A protein has these predicted regions:
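An acidic, Ser/Thr-enriched
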Residues: 160-208
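Exposed acidic/Ser/Thr-rich ligand/metal-binding surfaces
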Residues: 1-162
Length: 208
């Protein structure tokens, strides 16, 4: 599945690949790669017995932090068919790391394979990372999932959009009913809405 993802990358895209089981392995550094050569590197991998999900994600974050293109979209795409059972395994702790990275401009999308992965954890990580959450049943579906993910990246028109809401003196209290992260600021609050895509409409909903 990862080999298919690599073939969807454009000529200007830089992609890195990290593999994780009980250990974490850098397969491809963050760079432009020949799709066939990169795919062969990925296809040579063999699965292990455990899932160090946090270690893999943190290594990917390290790759992105070393990038030298500040204007680039930075996204971790986490693929797994298992449960986090090595490294950081507490869901709230993992979510906090992903949310912190999102505040620094790194989004996280998650793709779970088959029926053995932790769907609740991946959904929480994708929400915290302002990314997408997918379920993938096999190679045929993987092509569509990856096309959706890369198509979304290509249509990003603004990153890390936030809206600041300030109420008038006549308003006793204000709130947001959406599940966007909210931060209090003097005189109101700031709503983090993630990346904005061309042609997309976003709504903020509050009580009346």
């Amino acid at each position: 599945a990862t080999a298919q993802l690599l073939r969807l990358a454009g000529p200007d895209d830089r992609v890195g690949v990290v593999a994780f089981d009980e250990d974490v392995q850098l397969v491809l550094p963050l760079s432009r790669h020949d799709p066939d050569t990169a795919a062969n590197e990925v296809l040579a991998l063999r699965s292990g017995g455990s899932t160090n999900m946090s270690g893999g994600w943190l290594k990917a974050l390290e790759l992105l932090a070393g990038g030298r293109r500040p204007e680039a979209l930075r996204r971790v795409i986490l693929l797994t068919d298992g449960h986090a059972n090595v490294g950081i395994t507490e869901p709230d702790e993992m979510v906090a790391f992903v949310r912190g990275a999102q505040a620094q401009g790194v989004t996280t999308s998650c793709i779970g394979f088959a029926d053995g992965y932790d769907e609740h954890l991946l959904a929480a990580l994708a929400d915290a990372g302002m990314g997408n959450d997918y379920w993938c049943d096999g190679p045929d579906q993987a092509t569509r999932v990856f096309a959706d993910e890369f198509g979304g990246l290509a249509s990003v028109v603004a990153q890390n959009v936030s809206v600041e809401v300030r109420s008038s003196a006549r308003v006793a209290a204000a709130a947001v009913l959406n599940e966007f992260p909210v931060t209090e600021v003097p005189g109101g609050f700031q709503v983090a809405m993630g990346d904005a895509y061309g042609g997309e409409r976003r709504k903020l909903v509050g009580p009346v």
